[in-house]
Amino acid sequence: MLQKNDLIVITGAGGFIGGNLVKYFYDRGLLNIRAVDKKPLDEWYLRSPATMNLQLDCTTEEACARACDGAREVYNLAADMGGMGFIERFRVECLRGILINTHMIEAAYRAGVERYFFSSTACVYSTLLQQEANVRGLKETDVYPAMAERGYGWEKLISEMFCQEYWAERGLKTFIARFHNVYGPYGTWDGGREKAPAAICRKVIEAVDTNSRTIEVWGDGHQTRSFMYIKDCLKGIDMIMHCDRLIATPINLGSSQLFSVDELIDNVERIAGVKLDRKYNPSAPRGVTGRNSDNTFIKETLGWEPNTSLEVGLRATYHWIKDQYLCRKRGECVAA
């Protein structure tokens, strides 16, 4: 059990999930947090002046050693990634993420860290199982025989193996969560790295602001995904990290409710109070046809399931992005 003064290290803390995770622990009275990201501090989405905020590039051994020094728990959420447009166009950048986990897990082991969390992804699953929109939920065992998403998916799958072998050979307690489309406030919403929920919110906001009646939709609108709100994700991370039955055992962390891209747009339009025309772009990056999470294992093991509906989560996300959009329009400095 963590004590108030135990040092927690969170990498990727200048980003979406990492920044929200820092706030999650801080709000629960765990104040000894070392927050790490390679971005300049003024570009972090969330930043607490009461935590140790370090700008470090965790693709290097030296930075990882400095980050892990004295830590009891390490949450490795650092990654060079984005939405499907980024993942498909910049596979080399995504693959370089393996340097982060390689150096972080070794640094954690050398520093005597008790628990190490690795943020994996549903992109590790075989693309051959994701060729239909009405897809069945993916079980943890479906990852083999392997045919992961090119670049990003393979990097994460290999890093999962590192976590499993550090437990088997060196006794480091590692925990692996396969995230399924996390969304919410304080995340990237433009610039090419944003994911579908944020991108659609922004497109609708722009259309309303410019009196346009049309938004571009990547793909045909029929591709499907499940979407997990950030608050549900944070609770799941905490539960996974502190369950010894899950040491070195990958587990899905996501919603099992499937939505098409068109249904996602329908939800955002209702929140905005508009109805827009859709210009479909089948040649744009679209990823697999369908992907969903089978949550049988996490329900049986932890009793966890998401409790935030897509409508509620999207409403909070939409209004946060709208505020950011309007602030930027006024020339104010905002997260991006």
Question: Which role does the model predict for each range below?
Answer:
Residues 51, 55-97, 110, 127:
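NAD(P)H-binding glycine-rich loop region in Rossmannoid oxidoreductase-like domains
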Residues 76, 102-149:
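Conserved Rossmann-fold NAD(P)-dependent oxidoreductase catalytic core, especially the SDR/UDP-sugar
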Residues 206-336:
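C-terminal substrate-binding subdomain of Rossmann-fold SDR/epimerase-dehydratase oxidoreductases
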